[in-house]
Amino acid sequence: MSEETIRLGRERRYLVLLGIICLALIGGALYMQIVLGEAPCPLCILQRYALLLIALFAFIGAAMRTRRSITVFEVLVVICAIAGAGVAGHHVYTQFYPAVSCGIDVLQPIVDDLPLAKIFPLGFQVDGFCSTPYPPILGLSLAQWALVAFVLVVILVPLLTSRNRKALR
Protein backbone atom coordinates (compact mmCIF):
# COMPACT_ATOMS: atom_id res chain seq x y z
CA MET A 1 0.00 0.00 0.00
CA SER A 2 1.25 3.43 -0.85
CA GLU A 3 1.43 6.29 1.63
CA GLU A 4 -1.30 8.15 -0.26
CA THR A 5 -3.65 5.15 -0.11
CA ILE A 6 -3.16 4.90 3.65
CA ARG A 7 -3.79 8.62 4.14
CA LEU A 8 -6.89 8.63 1.93
CA GLY A 9 -8.16 5.63 3.89
CA ARG A 10 -7.76 7.67 7.06
CA GLU A 11 -9.76 10.52 5.51
CA ARG A 12 -12.47 8.08 4.48
CA ARG A 13 -12.71 6.84 8.06
CA TYR A 14 -12.98 10.44 9.30
CA LEU A 15 -15.80 11.05 6.84
CA VAL A 16 -17.67 7.88 7.86
CA LEU A 17 -17.32 8.87 11.52
CA LEU A 18 -18.59 12.37 10.73
CA GLY A 19 -21.59 10.94 8.87
CA ILE A 20 -22.44 8.63 11.77
CA ILE A 21 -22.16 11.50 14.27
CA CYS A 22 -24.48 13.68 12.15
CA LEU A 23 -27.05 10.88 11.91
CA ALA A 24 -26.77 10.37 15.68
CA LEU A 25 -27.44 14.09 16.23
CA ILE A 26 -30.55 13.85 14.05
CA GLY A 27 -31.59 10.76 16.02
CA GLY A 28 -31.12 12.70 19.26
CA ALA A 29 -33.27 15.52 17.92
CA LEU A 30 -35.98 13.02 16.96
CA TYR A 31 -35.79 11.47 20.43
CA MET A 32 -36.24 14.89 22.02
CA GLN A 33 -39.14 15.60 19.69
CA ILE A 34 -41.00 12.30 20.06
CA VAL A 35 -40.20 11.22 23.62
CA LEU A 36 -39.64 14.55 25.37
CA GLY A 37 -42.25 16.46 23.37
CA GLU A 38 -39.96 19.28 22.21
CA ALA A 39 -41.59 20.61 19.04
CA PRO A 40 -39.15 21.56 16.25
CA CYS A 41 -39.24 25.07 14.81
CA PRO A 42 -38.35 26.06 11.22
CA LEU A 43 -34.73 26.76 12.18
CA CYS A 44 -34.49 23.37 13.93
CA ILE A 45 -35.68 21.66 10.78
CA LEU A 46 -33.20 23.60 8.62
CA GLN A 47 -30.42 22.48 10.98
CA ARG A 48 -31.59 18.88 10.54
CA TYR A 49 -31.37 19.32 6.77
CA ALA A 50 -27.82 20.67 7.14
CA LEU A 51 -26.84 17.69 9.31
CA LEU A 52 -28.42 15.29 6.84
CA LEU A 53 -26.57 16.88 3.91
CA ILE A 54 -23.29 16.77 5.84
CA ALA A 55 -23.85 13.07 6.54
CA LEU A 56 -24.80 12.39 2.92
CA PHE A 57 -21.77 14.20 1.50
CA ALA A 58 -19.49 12.59 4.09
CA PHE A 59 -20.67 9.09 3.17
CA ILE A 60 -20.39 9.79 -0.56
CA GLY A 61 -16.94 11.29 -0.02
CA ALA A 62 -15.89 8.21 1.92
CA ALA A 63 -16.89 6.06 -1.06
CA MET A 64 -14.71 8.05 -3.48
CA ARG A 65 -11.35 6.67 -4.61
CA THR A 66 -9.34 9.71 -5.70
CA ARG A 67 -8.01 12.56 -3.62
CA ARG A 68 -9.70 15.13 -5.84
CA SER A 69 -13.16 13.54 -5.54
CA ILE A 70 -12.80 13.19 -1.77
CA THR A 71 -11.79 16.85 -1.60
CA VAL A 72 -14.90 17.90 -3.54
CA PHE A 73 -17.14 16.19 -1.00
CA GLU A 74 -15.13 17.56 1.93
CA VAL A 75 -15.71 21.05 0.52
CA LEU A 76 -19.44 20.31 0.22
CA VAL A 77 -19.43 19.13 3.85
CA VAL A 78 -17.81 22.40 4.95
CA ILE A 79 -20.25 24.49 2.88
CA CYS A 80 -23.21 22.70 4.49
CA ALA A 81 -21.64 23.18 7.92
CA ILE A 82 -21.22 26.91 7.28
CA ALA A 83 -24.88 27.13 6.27
CA GLY A 84 -25.86 25.13 9.36
CA ALA A 85 -23.75 27.41 11.57
CA GLY A 86 -25.51 30.42 10.09
CA VAL A 87 -28.93 28.95 10.83
CA ALA A 88 -27.88 27.83 14.32
CA GLY A 89 -26.35 31.25 15.02
CA HIS A 90 -29.60 32.94 14.04
CA HIS A 91 -31.48 30.46 16.22
CA VAL A 92 -29.25 31.28 19.21
CA TYR A 93 -29.81 34.99 18.57
CA THR A 94 -33.58 34.43 18.42
CA GLN A 95 -33.49 32.57 21.73
CA PHE A 96 -31.51 35.35 23.41
CA TYR A 97 -33.86 38.00 21.98
CA PRO A 98 -37.31 36.36 21.91
CA ALA A 99 -38.93 39.53 20.59
CA VAL A 100 -37.15 38.78 17.30
CA SER A 101 -39.28 36.10 15.70
CA CYS A 102 -37.75 33.51 13.41
CA GLY A 103 -40.67 34.15 11.10
CA ILE A 104 -42.69 31.00 11.61
CA ASP A 105 -45.39 32.43 9.35
CA VAL A 106 -42.85 32.98 6.58
CA LEU A 107 -40.55 29.98 7.02
CA GLN A 108 -43.08 27.33 8.04
CA PRO A 109 -44.77 26.86 4.64
CA ILE A 110 -41.41 26.93 2.86
CA VAL A 111 -39.83 24.34 5.17
CA ASP A 112 -42.98 22.21 5.19
CA ASP A 113 -42.98 22.16 1.37
CA LEU A 114 -39.48 20.70 1.15
CA PRO A 115 -39.45 17.10 -0.13
CA LEU A 116 -38.42 15.38 3.11
CA ALA A 117 -41.26 17.08 5.00
CA LYS A 118 -43.67 15.26 2.69
CA ILE A 119 -41.83 11.92 2.84
CA PHE A 120 -40.99 11.93 6.57
CA PRO A 121 -43.23 14.57 8.21
CA LEU A 122 -42.45 13.41 11.75
CA GLY A 123 -38.81 14.35 11.34
CA PHE A 124 -38.91 17.30 8.97
CA GLN A 125 -42.18 19.16 9.52
CA VAL A 126 -42.38 22.36 11.57
CA ASP A 127 -44.36 22.13 14.78
CA GLY A 128 -43.00 24.81 17.12
CA PHE A 129 -41.63 28.31 17.61
CA CYS A 130 -37.95 29.26 17.53
CA SER A 131 -38.12 31.34 20.69
CA THR A 132 -39.57 28.51 22.82
CA PRO A 133 -37.09 27.81 25.63
CA TYR A 134 -36.39 24.17 26.43
CA PRO A 135 -34.30 22.89 29.33
CA PRO A 136 -30.58 23.25 28.61
CA ILE A 137 -28.28 20.26 28.24
CA LEU A 138 -25.04 20.73 30.18
CA GLY A 139 -25.76 24.45 30.32
CA LEU A 140 -26.35 25.01 26.61
CA SER A 141 -29.54 25.13 24.58
CA LEU A 142 -30.00 22.80 21.61
CA ALA A 143 -29.36 25.69 19.23
CA GLN A 144 -26.07 26.44 21.00
CA TRP A 145 -25.04 22.77 20.81
CA ALA A 146 -25.90 22.76 17.10
CA LEU A 147 -23.79 25.88 16.60
CA VAL A 148 -20.87 24.21 18.41
CA ALA A 149 -21.24 21.09 16.24
CA PHE A 150 -21.35 23.03 12.97
CA VAL A 151 -18.39 25.23 13.92
CA LEU A 152 -16.40 22.12 14.87
CA VAL A 153 -17.11 20.61 11.45
CA VAL A 154 -16.07 23.86 9.73
CA ILE A 155 -12.79 23.88 11.67
CA LEU A 156 -11.94 20.18 11.95
CA VAL A 157 -12.63 18.93 8.42
CA PRO A 158 -10.14 21.30 6.72
CA LEU A 159 -7.69 20.96 9.62
CA LEU A 160 -7.68 17.16 9.59
CA THR A 161 -7.55 17.09 5.80
CA SER A 162 -4.60 19.47 5.59
CA ARG A 163 -2.70 17.71 8.38
CA ASN A 164 -3.38 14.34 6.79
CA ARG A 165 -2.18 15.48 3.37
CA LYS A 166 0.75 17.62 4.51
CA ALA A 167 3.27 14.78 4.21
CA LEU A 168 2.10 13.99 0.67
CA ARG A 169 3.21 17.35 -0.70
From Swiss-Prot:
Annotated InterPro entries: DiS_bond_form_DsbB/BdbC, Disulphide_bond_form_DsbB, DsbB, DsbB-like_sf
Cytoplasmic side: 1-14, 65-71, 164-169
Topology class, membrane: Multi-pass membrane protein
Location of the protein in the cell: Cell inner membrane
Main location per the UniProt record: membrane
Superkingdom classification of source: Bacteria
NCBIfam families to which the protein is assigned, alphabetical: PRK02110.1
Periplasmic side: 32-49, 90-144
One Gene Ontology term from the biological process aspect of the record: protein folding
Protein name in UniProt: Disulfide bond formation protein B 1
A Gene Ontology term for the protein's cellular component: plasma membrane
Keyword Disulfide bond recorded: yes
Known function: Required for disulfide bond formation in some periplasmic proteins. Acts by oxidizing the DsbA protein.
Gene3D superfamilies according to UniProt: DsbB-like (1.20.1550.10)
Higher taxonomy: Bacteria, Pseudomonadati, Pseudomonadota, Gammaproteobacteria, Pseudomonadales
Alphabetized UniProt keyword annotations: Cell inner membrane, Cell membrane, Chaperone, Disulfide bond, Electron transport, Membrane, Oxidoreductase, Redox-active center, Transmembrane, Transmembrane helix, Transport
Keyword Transport: yes
Membership in a protein family: Belongs to the DsbB family.
